[in-house]
Design a protein with these regions (language model features):
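Class I S-adenosyl-L-methionine
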Residues: 192-195, 206-259, 265-266
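C-terminal lobe and adjacent flexible extensions of AdoMet/dcAdoMet transferase-like proteins
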Residues: 240-350
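A short glycine-rich, Lys/Arg-flanked "PGG" loop and its adjoining helix->strand segment in the class I
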Residues: 161-177
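Class I SAM-dependent methyltransferase Rossmann-like catalytic core
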Residues: 2-33
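Conserved beta-strand signature within the Rossmann-like core of class I S-adenosyl-L-methionine
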Residues: 176-184
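Conserved SAM-binding loop of SAM-dependent methyltransferases across substrates and taxa
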Residues: 76-92
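S-adenosyl-L-methionine
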Residues: 109-136
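A short SAM/SAH-binding and catalytic strip from SAM-dependent methyltransferases
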Residues: 141-160
Length: 350
């Protein structure tokens, strides 16, 4: 990234998308951490359930303590700065230090200036390469890896196993209740690699905070040529909109295949409701004229369909659903091909 034009182009366009991906995934994980099971037959978030330790600020939850973020393969640190901004906004964390590691000294100099303007301290570690170089010593409340993992051992037949070893070692640098965020491109090959790694990490004792509502095997992996990614609507900065017009790029949605993980057992994922789902597809129209979405929950993937115009109370909510929405589906009808809206069905968006 030391080539000035390439870095300049990144700052004008992709910096903002990586920032948005980070913020959105952290927000998704926080929402999921509150989605604990109600008493039987109820829906919605259990008020007073509280935030899991993975989202408590600093040592012993104190907002006065130093909150430490490790950004690996940071570049100009969009992910680290987004995490700092998010934790400050969500939990009023005051003192934030970002340790940013990258091969490019120039990128980290820019990152330091950007972090300073965001009210965070940034410690530069350069030149640094993931794999050969050691992880900077310390205990971190949040570790972020933005579009780095797919570059590691990318042509090696045992790349998934080697990445698992890398992540397990990285977990030793997490503070109690700390979280790890991995962002990858929303592409088939990189996505399936991350999902395969996800399954191995779950078996190794990691917990998926987002986007998954299951700690079982990823159902997308079992289907050939399938992956899973998250979409986020955003309002691009003016410079991004202008570059879109000039280049023909379409960034109405920010997309990523990503995981938010923790080793904390207090996530209570076993308490998640059976009727809690993530929307993992775009709306589709089947041959019978029914509108269909694919949901993913504790039991895996399942279709939810409706014949629009039936006038059921949940139809309006159903028509507004988008990929990545977290929803409760109460009293759906059971069809041979999955779930369907009925007269008593209720949909609640988190």
């Amino acid at each position: 990234m030391d080539e000035n034009r390439r870095l300049g182009a990144y700052l004008l366009f992709y910096w903002f998308t990586s920032y948005t991906q980070t913020w959105a995934m952290l927000q998704m994980a926080q929402t999921a951490s509150l989605a604990l099971q109600h008493s039987e037959g109820t829906t919605g978030i259990r008020h007073g359930a509280g935030i899991t330790p993975a989202f408590q600020a600093g040592d012993e939850g104190s907002t006065e303590a130093l909150f430490r973020i490790l950004d690996l393969g940071a570049g100009p640190a969009p992910c680290g700065i987004a995490a700092a901004d998010w934790f400050r906004a969500a939990f009023h964390v005051r003192e934030i230090e970002i340790t940013a590691c990258d091969q490019s000294t120039l990128a980290l100099h820019i990152a330091e200036e950007l972090a300073q303007s965001a009210g965070a301290t940034l410690r530069r570690v350069a030149p640094w390469r993931a794999g050969p170089d050691p992880i900077p010593e310390g205990r971190y409340n949040c570790i972020v890896m933005g579009h780095l993992l797919n570059e590691l051992w990318k042509d090696a037949p045992d790349r998934i196993a080697r990445r698992e070893t890398f992540i397990i070692e990285l977990g030793n640098y997490l503070a109690e209740g700390g979280i790890l965020l991995i962002l990858e491109p929303a592409l088939l090959d990189t996505g399936r690699d991350l999902l395969a790694l996800r399954d191995r990490l779950v078996k190794s004792g990691w917990y998926i905070m987002a986007p998954c509502f299951t700690q079982g095997p990823c159902p997308a992996i079992a289907q050939h040529n399938q992956t899973c990614h998250s979409d986020f609507a955003w309002k691009p900065p003016r410079v991004v909109r202008e570059l879109e017009q000039r280049t023909g790029l379409d960034k109405d949605l920010v997309k990523t295949t990503a995981l938010v993980l923790t080793r904390s057992r207090s996530c209570q994922t076993s308490l998640l409701s059976d009727n809690l789902y993530r929307v993992v597809s775009e709306p589709m129209l089947n041959k019978a004229g029914r509108r269909r979405l694919i949901l993913c929950g504790k039991q895996g993937r399942i279709p939810l369909s409706a014949r629009l115009g039936d006038g059921y109370p949940a139809e309006s909510s159903f028509k507004q659903l988008c990929r990545s929405d977290a929803i409760y589906v109460d009293k759906p009808e059971q069809r041979e091909t999955g779930l369907a809206l009925g007269p008593e069905t209720r949909i609640t968006r988190l």
